[in-house]
Amino acid sequence: MAKLKNINGHFVESDYENALISFLEREGWQYLCGDSIKRANRKEVLNMEDLLQFLTKQNKDLENSEIQRIVDNVRLVGADTDFATLHKVYKWMIDGISAVNQKNEPVNVGLIDFEKIENNIFRVVNQFTVEYINNGVKKTRRPDVLLYVNGIPVCVIELKNPTDANTTIY
């Protein structure tokens, strides 16, 4: 395990981040710096390359246009509340999304392969800045670590120094 730096009785927060990333890499997650994820703007949170790669590899019987429709559904998902949006994506991750194959037959497309875990793309990402609007004001967040499965962020991790009494959640 990575050795944490102790400076005047305090540990350096980036060491916690590096230790977590190293641990996840040993468990098979692939590290990716958030700045290297291609996206149209900082409001985008998906890793489109991984999502497209997974869907294309897992669904050879789908036309590219149908795969793009699924990607667009995930990318443009929306609902009345943030909770409803998260619930919709969660349901898609568990149950899949309805699609139509090349024979014009209905099929269910999984966003995660629960049967063969090795078919999934696991990424641990840091240095990923996200822009959003809150009450009409543009804001940014840069979580310490994000976990992606097949291009979809499934976990946001904020690491805090337990010895720092002035630590905030942001």
Model-inferred region functions:
Residues M1-Y170:
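An alpha-helical interface "stripe"
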